[in-house]
Regions:
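Active-site helix-to-loop segments that bind/position phosphate- or nucleotide-bearing substrates
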Residues: 2-5, 11-12, 18-22, 26-27, ...
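Glycine/small-residue-rich interface belts in oligomeric ring/scaffold proteins
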Residues: 31, 38-93
Length: 344
C-alpha cells in the first residue's frame, strides 16, 4: 500500500495517541472543539512535512514515525525543505546489506550508473516527445551511454532537455537559485529525494554511499543517484502547473499540494504499473539485489508519451538497444483517494 504524505502548513500540535498521529490544529477550531482535531494511523504514514514555525511535535510521535520507517521533512522560512530525518534501522538484515554495498565492485557501480543515465535520458525524451519536440538525438545519446558515462551523454541530454522542455517565451534556465519555475522544481525534487532516501533505508542501504555521486559534503549521494530517472515525473507536474496558467512565482498551498502528489503518480515498469512511491521501493529493492550479486539489472520505470505509447521497449534499457516500438498495455491498480497526499 502506498504510504501517505502529510503536509502541515499551519500552527499545530502533533502527538501520539493509541498508535495514531493525533493532530491538533487551532486555526480550524470554530464553535466545535472537534473541528481542529484529527488523527491518522502511524502505519499509514510515509512522510511528514513540517512547514510552519509554530508546529510542535512530541518525542513520542517522532519515535513512532521513525519506528514505522516514516521520514520527517522540516521546511525553512521560504517553505523549502531544509532538513530530513530518517530511521537508523530500516531493514531486518541491514548489516548484511551494508556489507554487500560496501563491497560492491567499481565495474558494477559503473554499469548501474549506465542503466541509471539511460533511464533518465529516455524519460526526459518521453517528456519532450509529449510536447512535440524531436528526440532522435536523445535516443542516440541513451543508446551511446557506456558504463559510468565517461562521455557525459547524461549531461548533454540534460542541456538539450532544459533548453526546450518549457515554453520558449519563459527563457527558462535551470538553476537551483534561478527564476521560477525553478522554485517548483526544487520543491518537487526535495520531496522526491525524501521518498527515495526513505526507500533506500527500508531496503537496508546506506544513503551516503553513491554509485556515481560522491560529494564528501552530501549525505544522500545514493538517493541523488537513484532519483535521477524519476525526476522527469516531477518535471511533468511542474509543466502541468505552468501550462494551466497558474501563478508559479510563489509556492502557494495549491501548488505545494499538486507537487506532493508526486508520490501517487503512476509509473510504468516492464510488467506492471504502480504509484511512484511503490515504484521507487521496487527500484531500491532491485539495487540491493545488485549489491548482493543476485542480479546486475536495476529496475527503473520508463515513461509513456501522451499517446500512451513508449518511445522504446522496456528491455532496451538493459540490453543496450533502442527498438522504437510500443508495448502492449499491462494491468495496474491505481492508488485510491485515501492513499494520496494528505495536506493540512
Amino acid at each position: 500500500m502506498i504510504k501517505r504524505i502529510l503536509h502541515f502548513g499551519n500552527p499545530g500540535y502533533l502527538s501520539l495517541k493509541d498508535r495514531q498521529l493525533a493532530i491538533d490544529l487551532p486555526h480550524l477550531k470554530t464553535l466545535d472543539e472537534k473541528d481542529g482535531k484529527k488523527s491518522v494511523p502511524i502505519e499509514d504514514i510515509g512522510i511528514v512535512v513540517l512547514d510552519h514555525p509554530q508546529i510542535t511535535i512530541t518525542h513520542g510521535c517522532m519515535e513512532a514515525l521513525l519506528e514505522n520507517n516514516a521520514a520527517i521533512i522540516v521546511c525553512d522560512k521560504s517553505h523549502h525543505p531544509a532538513g530530513l530525518l530518517l530511521p537508523m534501522e530500516g531493514h531486518k538484515t541491514q548489516s548484511e546489506h551494508y556489507k554487500h554495498q560496501l563491497k560492491a565492485s567499481l565495474p558494477l557501480k559503473k554499469q548501474l550508473w549506465q542503466q541509471t543515465a539511460q533511464a533518465k535520458i529516455l524519460n526526459q525524451a518521453a517528456v519532450l516527445a509529449g510536447r512535440g519536440i524531436d528526440t532522435e538525438n536523445m535516443l542516440y545519446w541513451a543508446r551511446s551511454v557506456r558504463p559510468d558515462d565517461p562521455d557525459n551523454y547524461e549531461g548533454r541530454a540534460a542541456a538539450f532537455y532544459w533548453r526546450y522542455v518549457f515554453p520558449l517565451k519563459l527563457k527558462f534556465v535551470r538553476d537551483r537559485l534561478g527564476e521560477p519555475p525553478n522554485n517548483l522544481l526544487n520543491y518537487g525534487y526535495a520531496i522526491l529525494r525524501a521518498i527515495t532516501a526513505r526507500a533506500l533505508v527500508s531496503s537496508g542501504l546506506l544513503t551516503t554511499l553513491g554509485i556515481h555521486h560522491h560529494n564528501k559534503y552530501n549525505a544522500y549521494c545514493l538517493a541523488d543517484d537513484i532519483m535521477e530517472p524519476y525526476r522527469p515525473y516531477v518535471d511533468q507536474l511542474v509543466l502541468q502547473i505552468v501550462d494551466n496558467g497558474e501563478d508559479f512565482t510563489e509556492l502557494s498551498n495549491s501548488i505545494k499540494a499538486q507537487l506532493l502528489g508526486i508520490a501517487s503518480v503512476d509509473v510504468q515498469f516492464e510488467k506492471n504499473r504502480s504509484p511512484l512511491m511503490v515504484g521507487i521501493q521496487n527500484t531500491t529493492a532491485s539495487l540491493a539485489k545488485c549489491f548482493a550479486k543476485e542480479t546486475r539489472k536495476i529496475t527503473y520505470p520508463l515513461m509513456r508519451n501522451v499517446d500512451g505509447k513508449r518511445l522504446v521497449k522496456y528491455k532496451a534499457i538493459t540490453e543496450g538497444l533502442l527498438d522504437v516500438a510500443a508495448e502492449e498495455e499491462v494491468p495496474y491498480q491505481k492508488a485510491s483517494e485515501d492513499e494520496k497526499e494528505y495536506p493540512f
